[in-house]
Amino acid sequence: MAAAAAAAAGDSDSWDADTFSMEDPVRKVAGGGTAGGDRWEGEDEDEDVKDNWDDDDDENKEEAEVKPEVKISEKKKIAEKIKEKERQQKKRQEEIKKRLEEPEESKVLTPEEQLADKLRLKKLQEESDLELAKETFGVNNTVYGIDAMNPSSRDDFTEFGKLLKDKITQYEKSLYYASFLEALVRDVCISLEIDDLKKITNSLTVLCSEKQKQEKQSKAKKKKKGVVPGGGLKATMKDDLADYGGYDGGYVQDYEDFM
């Protein structure tokens, strides 16, 4: 009996030893060097994928944050340009306004000259206001030809003048063309200085003299082409004989009798 009990006790101890020596599968996975601690097998892989998604979201957020900064900087540059142009236009307007209020004292102007100077400055101010409005509201002109031109140099005005001439001379056959030009020249010259008006007047005077010479030459040519009194052939022969000292030897008389 004692031997049987001892054997049973030995088997019991062996069973207990085997029981306590069993490895916990959860612990085994955890002891395999995974970063998840007490996670099941494969669970750490899911978490890694999730972490990658978070990284993508963070990158997208950073890109989204950078884009508005670029837009803001561009808008800021445009706003600064507009402000700079506004300052320049305002300065120009102030100068024009000052000249309107305080006429030049160094040069004595007649009432007509003062009026012309004020009209010219007023026109400049209106043009300045118009340009400022266009730049402020971003007006983009899509017109062509004369309306699209904004001449500033000598060459620009030369080209501008050619276009105007081609446009106006289309109607030179009209009955109202001369009166139209008279009114047009008077209106466009009203703001000019006296010296400039004299230059234009002299230019027109020279043009008028040239036209008169051409007209006289044209009338003289028409008179030469008229009928010669006394007959063309006989008069020509008399002129030829007269070149020999006026002696005809009776040949002219014989010729006339024969005719």
UniProtKB/Swiss-Prot annotation:
It is found in: Cytoplasm. The modification Phosphotyrosine is found at residue 255. Residues 63-107 have a biased composition (Basic and acidic residues). It holds the Pfam family eIF3_subunit. GO terms for biological process: formation of cytoplasmic translation initiation complex. Residues 71-136 form a coiled coil. Residues 1-111, 218-247 are annotated as: Disordered. One of its GO terms (molecular function) is translation initiation factor activity. Keywords: Coiled coil, Cytoplasm, Initiation factor, Isopeptide bond, Phosphoprotein, Protein biosynthesis, Ubl conjugation. InterPro entries: eIF3-like_dom_sf, eIF3j. The modification Phosphoserine is found at residues 12, 14, 21, 128. Residues 1-70 are annotated as: Sufficient for interaction with EIF3B. There is a cross-link at residue 107 (Glycyl lysine isopeptide (Lys-Gly) (interchain with G-Cter in SUMO2)). Phosphorylated. Phosphorylation is enhanced upon serum stimulation. GO terms for cellular component: cytosol; eukaryotic 43S preinitiation complex; eukaryotic 48S preinitiation complex; eukaryotic translation initiation factor 3 complex. Gene3D superfamilies: Eukaryotic translation initiation factor 3 like domains (1.10.246.60). Residues 244-259 are annotated as: Promotes stable association with the 40S ribosome. Its main location: cytoplasm. The modification Phosphothreonine is found at residue 110. HAMAP family: eIF3j (MF_03009). Belongs to the eIF-3 subunit J family. Component of the eukaryotic translation initiation factor 3 (eIF-3) complex, which is required for several steps in the initiation of protein synthesis. The eIF-3 complex associates with the 40S ribosome and facilitates the recruitment of eIF-1, eIF-1A, eIF-2:GTP:methionyl-tRNAi and eIF-5 to form the 43S pre-initiation complex (43S PIC). The eIF-3 complex stimulates mRNA recruitment to the 43S PIC and scanning of the mRNA for AUG recognition. Component of the eukaryotic translation initiation factor 3 (eIF-3) complex, which is composed of 13 subunits: EIF3A, EIF3B, EIF3C, EIF3D, EIF3E, EIF3F, EIF3G, EIF3H, EIF3I, EIF3J, EIF3K, EIF3L and EIF3M. The eIF-3 complex appears to include 3 stable modules: module A is composed of EIF3A, EIF3B, EIF3G and EIF3I; module B is composed of EIF3F, EIF3H, and EIF3M; and module C is composed of EIF3C, EIF3D, EIF3E, EIF3K and EIF3L. EIF3C of module C binds EIF3B of module A and EIF3H of module B, thereby linking the three modules. EIF3J is a labile subunit that binds to the eIF-3 complex via EIF3B. PANTHER family: EUKARYOTIC TRANSLATION INITIATION FACTOR 3 SUBUNIT J. This is Eukaryotic translation initiation factor 3 subunit J. It comes from Rattus norvegicus (Rat). The gene is Eif3j.
